Amino acid sequence: MKNLLTNPQPSQSDYINAIVKLGSRVYEAAQVTPLQKMGKLSERLHNNIWIKREDRQPVNSFKLRGAYAMISSLSAEQKAAGVIAASAGNHAQGVALSAKQLGLKALIVMPQNTPSIKVDAVRGFGGEVLLHGANFDEAKAKAIELSKEKNMTFIPPFDHPLVIAGQGTLAMEMLQQVADLDYVFVQVGGGGLAAGVAILLKQFMPEIKIIGVESKDSACLKAALDKGEPTDLTHIGLFADGVAVKRIGDETFRLCQQYLDDMVLVDSDEVCAAMKDLFENVRAVAEPSGALGLAGLKKYVKQNHIEGKNMAAILSGANLNFHTLRYVSERCEIGENREALLAVTMPEQPGSFLKFAYVLGNRAVTEFSYRYADDKRACVFVGVRTTNEQEKADIIADLTKNGFDVEDMSDDDIAKTHVRYLMGGRAANDNERLYTFEFPEQKGALLKFLETLQNRWNISLFHYRAHGADYGNILAGFQIEQREQAEFEQGLAQLNYVFEDVTKSKSYRYFLR
């Protein structure tokens, strides 16, 4: 493995040799995981589909492979000094268990707002935890600082040849489990898993197609491919937190650019639908990033009309907060085009509801919200069960033909996350501005929010609903005069929360203003 560490750009053969040599070593901590057939989904999509069950690892994710590969390769002197890492997720647990298995000290620096369930998990695997900083970048900076002070080895989450090679042992298993795969779909966060899997499979199966899958709101590889080099994202979504990476690694980008055949981006609703498929097919409960590869597989098959092929995706992890499942159950039907969310305007007069019901006929209504607004028209928020995109189009056409104004809200995130729970009627606030905030799930966060803004501006609307993630999503309305807009946004900047002005949202216009 000497070439892997001394060559600034290790070759494919350098990586293959390292993966083969690490194969026996990694299994001192990790396990060979099954490649399981998804029968129902295979029938539905007319392809043979397998799922690689990395949720069966001792830390419930693939991250153990790369962490153990690197830590076990350290010199005796490095091992004696211990290892350090920065993470609020699966990498932290992989490093902690690897160090415990090898009898080493492990210090994990985690952001101060890390949920206690994740802190306890790291401690349960034998790691010492230091809570520091408001976000991952601050925690990482502290970890690197301490690694120099204490002479401990910093274990990166993805951008290191040994970590990449460790993840590649997963692909070695896949070769032995199904010999004739046509496609493999791999989730991309920092790129370590995708790079390790692609470089090995392309060596032994040159014709195989390796497809990278990213979340639309944290697509750091796509941004790097577009620019030609790794670049920082200005904002990342946090639902699939296991792949919520601001910047892809330099080495992982080099390998992904060379060995991936294509990319597909998926949204959170499509991820939720894939999580449901995993449960229904193999009774696995995946974390959102764990289901990302399968979500990409489903989308790619439909977009490219592929049939009769052998395909695999990786269930990369299952470390999720149980309360996340409530959000998943609400959103998975939209991700499969099995539910349409519509805003319907009708005359405010007797018989309108009955006519509306006649047009819908025997279709299953999943949600129906209405409140009186004025004497002329009524706006109704309705969910209707559908079987596909065409049926939704047919419903909209039927309603329009019968004199109803219809807006499709199925892709309106404000409607799906907030407005469907806020059917209290309109407010005559001409100077109201509407904002969304990513809100940390930690003690004192709401107090900080109110102390910064409440004394100066009146809050006219507020909606928050927890769904088990490290960050929640808040919708808030403020009464702001036009001349105060700049001053108000300066106040928002002091919060250090991600925010967006959504005053022009069509769901806000329909139901709340």
UniProtKB/Swiss-Prot annotation:
Listed EC numbers: 4.3.1.19
Alphabetized PANTHER family for the sequence: THREONINE DEHYDRATASE, MITOCHONDRIAL, THREONINE DEHYDRATASE, MITOCHONDRIAL-RELATED
UniProtKB keywords: Amino-acid biosynthesis, Branched-chain amino acid biosynthesis, Isoleucine biosynthesis, Lyase, Pyridoxal phosphate, Repeat
This protein's name: L-threonine dehydratase biosynthetic IlvA
Cofactor(s) named in the record: pyridoxal 5'-phosphate
Top-level enzyme category: lyase
Catalysed reactions, as listed in the record: L-threonine = 2-oxobutanoate + NH4(+)
PROSITE patterns named among the record's database cross-references: ACT_LIKE, DEHYDRATASE_SER_THR
Pfam families for the chain: PALP (PF00291), Thr_dehydrat_C (PF00585)
Function according to Swiss-Prot or TrEMBL: Catalyzes the anaerobic formation of alpha-ketobutyrate and ammonia from threonine in a two-step reaction. The first step involved a dehydration of threonine and a production of enamine intermediates (aminocrotonate), which tautomerizes to its imine form (iminobutyrate). Both intermediates are unstable and short-lived. The second step is the nonenzymatic hydrolysis of the enamine/imine intermediates to form 2-ketobutyrate and free ammonia. In the low water environment of the cell, the second step is accelerated by RidA.
GO molecular function: pyridoxal phosphate binding; threonine deaminase activity
UniProt pathway annotation: Amino-acid biosynthesis; L-isoleucine biosynthesis; 2-oxobutanoate from L-threonine: step 1/1
InterPro entries cross-referenced by the UniProt entry: ACT-like_dom_sf, Ser/Thr_Dehydratase, Ser/Thr_deHydtase_PyrdxlP-BS, TD_ACT-like, TD_ACT-like_sf, Thr_deHydtase_biosynth, TrpB-like_PALP, TrpB-like_PALP_sf
Annotated source species: Haemophilus influenzae (strain ATCC 51907 / DSM 11121 / KW20 / Rd)
UniProt cross-references to NCBIfam families, sorted A to Z: ilvA_2Cterm, PRK09224.1
Residue ranges annotated for the ACT-like domain, each copy included: 340-411, 433-504
